[in-house]
């Protein structure tokens, strides 16, 4: 009996090694396709299908262990991530950002201003984005989400099947990019073994960024989500909330719904982007005295950085670095639907 048990355990170990080896071989074989597909914008292709195969192969290993709940995952990352981890992984994410757009857009800072000033120190637009940039492999599905929301926090919003498809398309697209692969590998290294499964990655990002919650004090209207606040803008009475995306701001400028008054301060991120603090008027009358945003960075890099800091340093300064330039991301959280979610997130320097 003992001999049979020993033989059974040996076979189990061998099978586990074979499964892990198979997963590694599959992933290495599709890396060229992942890079190519991120450039050619092909959706539902063999690379995506093979990623799902990785999920099922590695999932065979994960299923033998107890999967962590959402709350347990957040606590695990928060407790196990060191300050040095954050500096290292942020450098890695920036270096992996192949869809950086800084060299393809025009940024016209013009005059300096202050949060209290009402003077227009910038007669021209802040950002000019050429059409080919809007059609970029990750920017196109990102911008497709802009018309899915209404800026008023008490106006009801209902997610249609098409809008949910657009959410998943965006998530699938960015999961094939360098910054998001770095994030998922980092989460696995912190003990979140289920992040080896592709569908688990999709569900995590969908939960963090697209779970609907109420922002108004009545709590009656689930009219907001993290994506809408961070990457777009919301209005609560006359107060502008969010608006930390340079792409959304550029779109508002194109539509003549944003008037850039000038910049307050800026930080150069070693040629890979800027962090800009600026003053603008939205929708002709809504004052946004101190907006902070990355400029030129890709949607996937920003999503990866904000997700990292939400999980590792919620409600605290998340100190990062690129090319020896230090900066911080500040996240604020709220509890809704019995979940800890992103209230807002933005860069600070």
Q: In which residue ranges do the predicted regions lie?
A:
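Low-complexity, intrinsically disordered/propeptide-like segments
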Residues: 8-12, 34-37, 54, 77, ...
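A cross-kingdom marker for long, charged
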Residues: 315-349
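N-terminal "domain-start" segment
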Residues: 55-321
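Compositionally biased, low-structure terminal segments
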Residues: 9-11, 28, 232, 249
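Cleavable N-terminal signal peptides of Sec/SRP-targeted secreted and luminal proteins
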Residues: 2-16
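N-terminal, immediately post-signal peptide pro-regions of secreted/luminal proteins
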Residues: 17-68
């Amino acid at each position: 009996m003992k001999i049979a048990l020993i033989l059974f355990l040996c076979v189990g170990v061998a099978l586990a090694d074979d499964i892990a080896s198979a997963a590694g071989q599959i992933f290495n074989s599709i890396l060229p396709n992942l890079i190519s597909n991120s450039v050619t914008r092909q959706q539902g292709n063999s690379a995506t299908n093979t990623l799902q195969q990785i999920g099922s192969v590695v999932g065979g290993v994960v299923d033998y262990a107890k999967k962590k709940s959402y709350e347990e995952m957040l606590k695990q990352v928060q407790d196990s991530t060191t300050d040095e981890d954050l500096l290292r992984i942020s450098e890695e994410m920036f270096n992996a950002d192949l869809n950086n757009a800084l060299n393809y857009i025009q940024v016209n800072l013009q005059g300096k201003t202050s949060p209290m000033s009402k003077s227009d120190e910038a007669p021209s637009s802040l950002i000019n984005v050429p059409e080919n940039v809007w059609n970029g492999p990750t920017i196109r599905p990102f911008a497709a989400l802009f018309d899915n929301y209404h800026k008023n926090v008490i106006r009801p919003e209902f997610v249609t099947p098409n809008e949910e498809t657009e959410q998943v398309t965006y998530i699938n697209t960015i999961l094939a990019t360098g910054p998001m692969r770095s994030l998922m590998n980092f989460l696995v290294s912190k003990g979140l073994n289920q992040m080896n499964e592709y569908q688990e990655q999709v569900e995590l990002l969908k939960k963090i960024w697209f779970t609907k919650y109420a922002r108004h004090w009545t709590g009656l209207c689930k009219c907001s989500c993290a994506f809408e606040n961070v990457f777009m803008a919301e209005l609560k009475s006359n107060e502008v909330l969010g608006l930390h995306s340079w792409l959304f701001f550029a779109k508002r400028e194109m539509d003549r719904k944003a008037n850039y008054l000038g910049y307050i301060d800026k930080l150069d991120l070693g040629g890979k982007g800027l962090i800009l603090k600026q003053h603008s008027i939205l929708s002709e009358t809504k004052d946004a005295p101190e907006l902070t945003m990355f400029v030129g960075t890709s949607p996937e890099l920003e999503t990866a950085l904000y997700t990292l800091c939400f999980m590792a340093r919620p409600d605290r300064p998340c100190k990062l670095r690129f090319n020896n330039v230090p900066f911080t991301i500040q996240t604020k959280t709220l509890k809704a639907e019995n979940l800890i979610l992103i209230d807002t997130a933005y860069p600070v320097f």
